[in-house]
Amino acid sequence: FNLGDIYESRAIYAFYRDAIDGAIAQMKQTPYVNEKVYDEETGRMVTKRLKKSDALLPANPFNGFITDCHDCEHAKKQRTPYTKLSFLEKVKEMEAKIAQNDDVYNNALLVGNAFYNASYYGSLRAFYYNNILGEAGSLGVKDENRVLLLGMDKAKQYYLLAQKHATNDEQRAKIAYLLAKTERNEFYNQAYFYKNKDGANY
């Protein structure tokens, strides 16, 4: 592992604890390293000096849709591309507005979407790809990362906060649907992810 892996992993763990200041501080410390990346213009792999904090996320972290379709989200052109660092900074900005009682419904909804999308079920799996976590896009997650990456607690926390501040039926219906998605995922966790070979829950 290199220093970038270490700082990035600390930032990822801090994010899932909702310790956003700590996540930002750790992500900012990722150093520049030489990385092989695909150059679309030349169609070849090239070496570039990059920081892990500057890695572009493949989808808008704050969008929430009826259907989870990673490929659909990744194919869309982003009006505002987010890096791992700018994503964290935007979450901090929204959480500050919530603390100031500023447009709580919309900010809580968007932060809830951020936590949902950064889970295994969302469109931002790339956020948690890290050599120390040992995650890089497989169809499942490692046993030791299940609670971290399959958990819906933070998404539900912010969706419930948004629900409390909903002012019309459309807003209430939207939150009800998003909460239903988290409950569906919790069912999937129990039915498929948290069972060992004997069928007992972890």
Which role does the model predict for each range below?
Residues F1-Y202:
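Extracytoplasmic/secretory-pathway proteins
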